[in-house]
Amino acid sequence: MQHIEADIEQLQMKVAFQEDTIEELNKALIKQQKQLELLEFQLSHVINKVKEIDVPSGDSQEVEPPPPHY
């Protein structure tokens, strides 16, 4: 009988440990999801800024002088 009680107690401890682990993993997942959403927002903002940059086309006949360090 004591063996069964010890087994039950051990199982209860394992379940409690697993519940704690699941809770910690859930918190980490929520934090990562928030970070991912922020990074997606920031990336979208950067993409929009890059699209706004006026890049001259390669069709220009002007030859740019070399940079001063040459």
UniProtKB/Swiss-Prot annotation:
InterPro entries: SlyX (IPR007236). Pfam families: SlyX (PF04102). Signal peptide: none annotated. Belongs to the SlyX family. This is Protein SlyX homolog. The gene is slyX.
